[in-house]
Amino acid sequence: MSEPSSSKVKADSLLPPAKSTTAATAARSANGSTNTGASQLTKHGIELPSQEDAERLGFNVFSHILDPRLLRALADLGYGIPTPIQQKAIPLALAGKDILARARTGSGKTLAYGLPLLQKVLDAKSAVAKSDANHQLTRALVLVPTRELAEQVFRHLSVVIEYVRDDIRLVNVAREASEKVQRLLLSEKPDVVIATPSKALNYLQNASLDLKSGMESLAIDEADLILSYGHDADVKSLLGANFLPSHFQSFLMSATMTSDVSKLKGLLLRNPVVLKLNHDDEAASGSNLVQFYTKTTEEDKFLLAYVILKLKLIRGKAILFVNELERGYRLKLFLEKFGLRACVLNAELPINSRYSIVEEFNKGKFDYIVATDEPTGASGNMQDDEGDDEEEDADEREADEVDEQAEDQREAGKKRKSSEHAGAETKSNKSKVSQHRKGKNGASEYGVSRGVDFINVSCVINFDLPTSVDSYIHRVGRTARGGASGTALSFVVPSDQVGRSKYLYCASTTRDESVFKMLNKPSTISLLGSALQEWKYDSSSVAGFHYRVTDTLKSITKALIREARIKELKNEILTSSKLQSHFEDHPDDLAFLQHDKALLTSRAQQSHLKHVPQYLVPKIINPGAKLTKSSGSEYKGYVPKNKIKDGANDRKNKGGKRRSSTGKNTTGAAGKSRKKVDPLRKFSNK
């Protein structure tokens, strides 16, 4: 879909656009391929499928290098055409190359490294007799920055191995389970282990996890966040100590190229193939993200959120990102006052509850999530990514020009030196690592904007502008995933408006203009694929809602927010314990979980706010259209103070006569008696 030619965009344009190798591998390759299109030959002499073949054959274009059982599972899951990153990464990975891939979120990076990783496990086990002790070894480790992403990767790979479950076992040690249970699972030497760096290091140090005996592949997903999420000490200890074999294949998958990725590249990769998904590839995959911004005040943020959601200027599901936990609950309570159901996704909730919220949202049980994306580590610092592309091009040229054997020797020397240096530092780092885990482990392993796969999200609203370009890229990556279309809208507070409203003040707004300037740099626009367009709305058309919004915001006090947080946290802790035990045996009971239930008491709720009087509806809405309440009943313009009793013939409302057991006519309980009785007349003072 082409972008609007004018920078002035009408309010209704916020509607999202329409959706548009090993011996075994060599043996399969000898059987021939059905490809007939013009395949691409890389400078490494590896054949890549053409776009025409990929569109015609789907994942069967890899039939000569992937196990038929994996292809069958992909077909059952409805996977059609492999994405550009998958078309390039899978053949190169199965040829034994280290991969450094940069592609936007939602481009299919998980399968891009997951399929080669699983295929290598199948090939290795087929070459060893089952009676051999080396048949069952842990051959692959997948490191991710957050527990949510670990669970997501585990579930994605679990369905892909549907027809090879007898040959491949997966374990996710990032889950909240007792260490005794996890150690028991690891003692069986699962083929693939998925973990956060801190969890992996913990089990390596207590000898529960053995990677040195047989690990062949190491994949780091969301590599740009691994170090910035407070895992830097854990990663350095994991790579520097004597836990890993001397040779293994590495995959670094990232949405952005940062200094953290460069550090990991130097530590892990040997003569890597650098893959960068360009905008032509994104267009070929059908990605269509339209980005808007508007400059507004803190109070008007709530006004615009109300107008956009209540008047349904966007259709479908939406994620609203805030930078502070308290603001997340303030926004939820604010929307709740107007009858808009939403839930808050934040680091305070147990991991099972957080993942359950994502699952319910993906299933369509509610349409709006308020996600706290608090700046942590390097992500909280403003980063100027200008020059990243030049660094990548230089790195790629260097990787191509250097002779592979000389590079291997040099990297081996580096690893020996780093191993010796790390050995000397291990003792001094141990105390720091343990202190870091005690204080920050829970928060560092939470991240809703990074990697978590939200399904069919129509719009991302940056209620609070992120504090870095990288964070912005990850946030807007929650929509327009997998070839779908989506919209991103960002609220920017001008510097002269910062701090005007003390009770709505957000510290990160002091950086809004600086971050906004970085988002408009040519290098960032090139990375995003398009520039942000200004959304200019008619302020007079929404002025009538100001009094509603202002009064409602004043009613949401800090005490009310604190009570709501405590109430929800207690409920979610109970829910989480049930999820761990009871709901594993009774999955149908999950339907009774409601993570978006009201936090306000019935007295605090004002039912008239759930309706929009017809005289307030702006002209941008079709005058003939009828707005609907959250319950789905028909909208009525006039809302009286007292409830109107409908149905004149209804016995319950009318209070009609009924015959008692004695045969006398009595008045219905809901109706009024014909003769008023004064109780004081019958009162006798005896």
Curated annotation (Swiss-Prot):
Residue ranges of every copy of the Helicase ATP-binding domain listed in the record: 90-275
Single GO MF descriptor: RNA binding
Record carries keyword Manganese: no
Record-given protein name: ATP-dependent RNA helicase DBP9
Biased composition (Basic and acidic residues): 419-428, 643-653, 676-686
PROSITE patterns given in the database record: HELICASE_ATP_BIND_1, HELICASE_CTER, Q_MOTIF
Positions with biased composition (Basic residues): 429-440
GO cellular component: nucleolus
Example GO biological process: rRNA processing
Positions annotated to bind ATP: 103-110
SUPFAM superfamilies: P-loop containing nucleoside triphosphate hydrolases (SSF52540)
Family (UniProt): Belongs to the DEAD box helicase family. DDX56/DBP9 subfamily.
Record text about domains: The Q motif is unique to and characteristic of the DEAD box family of RNA helicases and controls ATP binding and hydrolysis.
Domain Helicase C-terminal: 288-543
Sequence ranges of Acidic residues compositional bias: 383-406
Catalytic activity: ATP + H2O = ADP + phosphate + H(+)
CDD domains per record: DEADc_DDX56, SF2_C_DEAD
UniProt keywords, alphabetically: ATP-binding, Helicase, Hydrolase, Nucleotide-binding, Nucleus, Ribosome biogenesis, RNA-binding, rRNA processing
Source species: Mycosarcoma maydis (Corn smut fungus)
Gene: DBP9
Motif segment (Q motif): 59-87
EC number assigned by the record: 3.6.4.13
Cell compartment(s), UniProt: Nucleus, Nucleolus
